[in-house]
Amino acid sequence: MQVNIFCIQKSDEFKTWSEKYSKLISKYATLKEINVFNKKIALAQNLNAIEAKKSYEEAFMPYKKGYCIALDEKGKDLTSIEFAKLIQDKNELSFFIGGAYGLREEFNQSLDFRLSLSKLTLAHQFVKTLLLEQIYRAFCINNNHPYHK
């Protein structure tokens, strides 16, 4: 399985944790993490939320492939077991984590699924680390590994 995570961020403040879960996931799947941040996004974020969201969408469009999942606070809440079932039979997964302003509704609706990790607003850098842990947990559930108790 190929797992892709696309995130609007310049750097990874949670790099140590991200690397830990990336290594664990590599036992089950090929993982590609791409931090998308360019000059257009930086300028748009200084203008307003609408322009920022448009710039995120433009940056993400070339990466829409496989089963696409938006991380969205208005998305569906799943248990870890439900999440494991959701990703179980997919050949390729692409997760999209918006920047400070989130993602446009139209972009979210164009994807296959909208996932909420929490009703709380979370820093997008933290969301990526939390998502990596849940992906690893899902692989453990699907492979009867004792990590998920």
Curated annotation (Swiss-Prot):
Its job: Specifically methylates the pseudouridine at position 1915 (m3Psi1915) in 23S rRNA.
Entry EC no(s): 2.1.1.177
Record has Cytoplasm as a keyword: yes
The protein's name: Ribosomal RNA large subunit methyltransferase H
Quaternary structure annotation from Swiss-Prot or TrEMBL: Homodimer.
Binding residues for S-adenosyl-L-methionine: 71, 98, 117-122
Main enzyme class: transferase
Keyword Transferase in record: yes
InterPro entries with a match to the protein in the record: Alpha/beta_knot_MTases, RlmH-like, tRNA_m1G_MTases_N
Superkingdom per UniProt: Bacteria
Keywords, ordered alphabetically: Cytoplasm, Methyltransferase, rRNA processing, S-adenosyl-L-methionine, Transferase
HAMAP family: 23SrRNA_methyltr_H
Gene Ontology cellular component annotations, sorted alphabetically: cytoplasm
Annotated catalysed reactions: pseudouridine(1915) in 23S rRNA + S-adenosyl-L-methionine = N(3)-methylpseudouridine(1915) in 23S rRNA + S-adenosyl-L-homocysteine + H(+)
Gene, per the UniProt record: rlmH
Any GO MF annotation of the entry: rRNA (pseudouridine-N3-)-methyltransferase activity
Family the UniProt entry places it in: Belongs to the RNA methyltransferase RlmH family.
Localisation per UniProt entry: Cytoplasm
